[in-house]
Amino acid sequence: MVLPNFKENLEKYAQLLVANGINVQPGHTLALSIDVEQRELAHLIVKEAYALGAHEVIVQWTDDVINREKFLHAPMERLDNVPEYKIAEMNYLLENKASRLGVRSSDPGALNGVDADKLSASAKAMGLAMKPMRIATQSNKVSWTVAAAAGLEWAKKVFPNAASDEEAVDLLWDQIFKTCRVYEEDPVKAWEDHAAILKSKADMLNKEQFSALHYTAPGTDLTLGLPKNHVWESAGAINAQGEGFLPNMPTEEVFTAPDFRRADGYVTSTKPLSYNGNIIEGIKVTFKDGQIVDITAEKGDQVMKDLVFENAGARALGECALVPDPSPISQSGITFFNTLFDENASNHLAIGAAYATSVVGGAEMSEEELEAAGLNRSDVHVDFMIGSNQMDIDGIREDGTRVPLFRNGDWAN
């Protein structure tokens, strides 16, 4: 298989990411995080950003092989300390209100077999050191977009029966272009129409201001409280400078934060999770009074336990997102082993930090005020997928009346 018009579509994709995703404006600083394998796309993104008037584009290259070797051989005292130059770079980006574009293409199992203690220690250290950047991002002080590119090892996992490595990569690029509407005659208009549909769902939920959500499905019976004055968000967001951007490309979700003090019941994952270079399957979580009291996984059990019990704030939830099972990504029938795609095929929850914008006025609140409002504070934010065509969700009003939101995995109305 040779993907027709690949270079033309890759150029359209780069333009879409820069102009519509991150929405580069004259004078902007852009930080681009991208794998060395994606050099061609990186060059197109950099050219497009400067063409739109960016003053500086900083490329932060990543490499799965180098990263794995570091975890295999570096001593623990190096892994649980973040070098000063990384903190200095973060501060420079914050001072310049740099937009952040992350293009993900890593092998989902790049760190399989690496000592879980090393992974946990490094993730914890990075979470603490990068806290100012996380806060700026999660409160939309700066624009940020997460997108994807077809990495070889990732493509081989998604399409193991492809006739060749090249075909696997082409098949994955084809899915990325489809779900990001690159093939549409007018991709920008297609995104505007899609965003309007998602916004209508968010508007309905914001008007209702449900007190809680009740999820039921095989292996799931969970009630999540919602904070007062919570805000459901959808495709588009606005940064502190009043500029629009798209946090995720693709996206099919509407989302808010649950009240981290009010979660009771149990939930079972329905798709694999790729986290910290490991593929985790069969996650089961039990909640009582907002806290995770038990978590197990059929594969990657220790990685999940370390995530929840070794990181501050990771025993509670920071996000609940609604995605209908008939979404295009779900209907493709493909498991992508990549949260950006798999979360947009399924209802999902996030362990850890809530986005500040999930309550009215949250972007201007202190960490203490956000916590008092019911928004979980943590150094981690990890989505896991729980939806299926067997899931029902009810919205529960203050007076206890129930409104069907989802039936058999799709919007009830």
Segments and roles (model prediction):
Residues 15, 206-208, 276-279, 313, ...:
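Short solvent-exposed loop/turn micro-motifs enriched in small/polar/acidic residues
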Residues 112-115, 155-160, 236-237, 278-281, ...:
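A short secondary-structure junction signal
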Residues 225, 295-296, 406:
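Short linear motifs in exposed loops
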Residues 262-264, 280-282, 289-292, 315-319, ...:
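Active-site lining segments that contact anionic ligands and/or coordinate catalytic metals
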